[in-house]
Amino acid sequence: MTTVLGIETSCDETGVGIARLDPDGTVTLLADEVASSVDEHVRFGGVVPEIASRAHLEALGPAMRRALAAAGLKQPDIVAATIGPGLAGALLVGVAAAKAYSAAWGVPFYAVNHLGGHLAADVYEHGPLPECVALLVSGGHTHLLHVRSLGEPIIELGSTVDDAAGEAYDKVARLLGLGYPGGKALDDLARTGDRDAIVFPRGMSGPADDRYAFSFSGLKTAVARYVESHAADPGFRTADIAAGFQEAVADVLTMKAVRAATALGVSTLLIAGGVAANSRLRELATQRCGEAGRTLRIPSPRLCTDNGAMIAAFAAQLVAAGAPPSPLDVPSDPGLPVMQGQVR
């Protein structure tokens, strides 16, 4: 049995999670502590890097103590941290702390990819991840990936050419007066609307477009133009706009993800990242995977957002695959590509 502590500080959530790796490869969640600074960013309409970094400094120590107490440990066998991608200052807080704990405890350090952590979070609820196509959707990233195993290099099939899906959600939510962060507020509003009342364009979905690339900038612009043109109409309903926008996003994401799994002959589709908590995306993915004969895996909403548990899970998978630790002088990398799971 090996215990792995994961630290996540890539954006505005301070996460400390602890996982247990058993000899048979099973990964069990022992502790998951998250402190968010989102309320401090609301008045700015987005994450302010300096505020996020200071919040991590204040929250990390208490979160560490709570996680160790919850797991019943004095120290773990391994320490891991998000090395990138993310906000430079925020990453430095978590990486510096993880290296210090690693040195003080005399345990190995693993520098892992934040995005790989999102993929790994699913193992807590559904067991070891088989070969799969993964749709990774969050506030800053939208990728379609071929994952043979979490211990091997990840193959990128496609990504967004402009806005990430989560970024589009936040911008449209702001346009509709829903505030920041907008993902959940827009999802809740969309449930009360008619998703067929307004049909918004599906970017990069034509026969000449890249089969696995995404674009949400045009959709965002279409929503803005619709609001500008119809705001004075007697029947103007923001719920219908939200529902139509959400349907356009979920339609393209699930269509391309299922298409990739079918084309590659891969039986499992994994959806991960913060946007994976969206109700319509989960519903439509379930429907389309059923029609295509694919197995769908999506973590519970609480594991879709940023947390330390996912970093612990990813590091545990690397340990199980025989990956060596990272050196303590490895630098953080705000632009780390999704294909590189570990920096060493």
UniProtKB/Swiss-Prot annotation:
Cofactor(s) demanded: Fe(2+)
Domain of life from the UniProt record: Bacteria
GO MF annotations, alphabetized: iron ion binding; N(6)-L-threonylcarbamoyladenine synthase activity
Reaction catalysis annotation: L-threonylcarbamoyladenylate + adenosine(37) in tRNA = N(6)-L-threonylcarbamoyladenosine(37) in tRNA + AMP + H(+)
EC numbers on record: 2.3.1.234
Keyword Acyltransferase: yes
One Gene Ontology biological process: tRNA threonylcarbamoyladenosine modification
Keywords, alphabetical: Acyltransferase, Cytoplasm, Iron, Metal-binding, Transferase, tRNA processing
Region (Disordered): 325-344
Predominant subcellular localization, coarse grouping: cytoplasm
Residues noted as binding substrate in the record, renumbered to the chain: 136-140, 170, 183, 187, 278
Cell compartments where the protein resides: Cytoplasm
Protein family: Belongs to the KAE1 / TsaD family.
Summary of the function given for this chain in its UniProt record: Required for the formation of a threonylcarbamoyl group on adenosine at position 37 (t(6)A37) in tRNAs that read codons beginning with adenine. Is involved in the transfer of the threonylcarbamoyl moiety of threonylcarbamoyl-AMP (TC-AMP) to the N6 group of A37, together with TsaE and TsaB. TsaD likely plays a direct catalytic role in this reaction.
Designated name of the protein: tRNA N6-adenosine threonylcarbamoyltransferase
